[in-house]
C-alpha cells in the first residue's frame, strides 16, 4: 500500500497545527520550525491571500487524511461507506478512521504516533483476538482484544512507549489497557467527543458532495 514517506514536519506546517505525526520528544526539538515558519513549506508568502471556499474544504480534508495517514483513494472509500451508513456522514467518517487498528494502538499508548503504530502492525507484531493482523486499516469492534506479540514485548520501543503513556495518562476512554499483560480491549465505539483533531467534518462532506 502506498504511503507518504517524506518529512512529516512539512505536512504539519502545511496544515498549520500539530497532527500528532511525531512523538512529543522529537516534536519539541522541531517546535521552532512550526512556530517561526507559520506558512506552508517553500518561500515565505509575500501576502496572505483570502482562501476560497474550495480551498478551505480541501484543507480540512487534507488535515484529516494526514493525521490518520490515509491516502486519497482509501479516504474516498471511507467517505462513501460513511455516507451509506445510518447516522451523520461526517461523524461516521471520523469513527471509521478512529477504529483503524493502527489508530487503536496509538490510542492505547503502545505507539507514540500513528506512523509508528503502522510500522508495528506491518511487521506483524500485533495480535487481534489471538490472531496476527498485519493490515493497518483493520477495523476493530467492541470486545476486540489487542495484544503485543510475546517476542516484541521486550522491545525498547514498547517499554519506552508504555512508560510515556503511563506518565501522561494518554489512553483513550473508549479502550482499556493492561500494560502488565501488553494488551488492551475495545470497550465501546469512539464518538465525536473522542476526536482530538480540530476538524470541521461537515466541510469535508460538502466537498465530496459536489
Curated annotation (Swiss-Prot):
Superkingdom assignment: Bacteria
Domain S4 RNA-binding: 99-162
Entry GO MF terms: rRNA binding; structural constituent of ribosome
SMART domains in the cross-refs: Ribosomal_S4 (SM01390), S4 (SM00363)
Chain segments carrying region Disordered: 30-49
GO-annotated biological processes: ribosomal small subunit biogenesis; translation
Protein's UniProt keywords contain Hydrolase: no
Protein keywords: Ribonucleoprotein, Ribosomal protein, RNA-binding, rRNA-binding
PROSITE patterns membership: RIBOSOMAL_S4, S4
Annotated GO CC locations: small ribosomal subunit
Function: One of the primary rRNA binding proteins, it binds directly to 16S rRNA where it nucleates assembly of the body of the 30S subunit.
Record family assignment: Belongs to the universal ribosomal protein uS4 family.
HAMAP family: Ribosomal_uS4_B (MF_01306_B)
Stored PANTHER family: 30S 40S RIBOSOMAL PROTEIN, SMALL RIBOSOMAL SUBUNIT PROTEIN US4M
Subunit: Part of the 30S ribosomal subunit. Contacts protein S5. The interaction surface between S4 and S5 is involved in control of translational fidelity.
Protein name (database record): Small ribosomal subunit protein uS4
Amino acid at each position: 500500500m502506498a504511503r507518504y514517506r517524506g518529512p512529516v514536519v512539512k505536512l504539519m506546517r502545511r496544515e498549520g497545527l500539530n497532527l500528532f505525526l511525531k512523538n512529543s520528544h522529537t516534536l519539541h526539538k522541531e517546535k521552532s520550525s512550526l512556530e517561526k515558519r507559520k506558512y506552508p513549506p517553500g518561500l515565505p508568502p509575500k501576502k496572505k491571500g483570502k482562501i476560497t471556499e474550495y480551498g478551505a474544504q480541501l484543507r480540512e480534508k487534507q488535515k484529516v487524511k494526514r493525521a490518520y495517514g490515509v491516502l486519497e483513494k482509501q479516504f474516498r472509500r471511507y467517505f462513501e461507506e460513511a455516507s451509506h451508513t445510518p447516522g451523520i456522514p461526517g461523524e461516521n467518517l471520523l469513527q471509521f478512521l478512529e477504529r483503524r487498528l493502527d489508530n487503536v494502538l496509538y490510542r492505547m499508548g503502545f505507539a507514540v504516533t500513528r506512523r509508528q503504530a503502522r510500522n508495528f502492525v506491518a511487521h506483524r507484531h500485533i495480535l487481534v483476538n489471538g490472531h496476527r493482523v498485519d493490515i493497518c486499516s483493520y477495523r476493530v469492534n467492541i470486545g476486540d482484544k489487542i495484544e503485543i506479540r510475546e517476542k516484541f514485548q521486550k522491545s525498547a520501543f514498547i517499554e519506552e512507549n508504555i512508560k510515556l503513556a503511563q506518565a501522561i495518562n494518554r489512553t483513550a476512554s473508549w479502550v482499556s489497557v493492561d500494560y502488565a499483560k501488553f494488551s488492551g480491549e475495545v470497550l465501546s465505539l469512539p464518538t465525536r467527543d473522542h476526536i482530538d483533531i480540530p476538524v470541521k467534518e461537515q466541510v469535508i462532506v460538502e466537498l465530496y458532495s459536489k
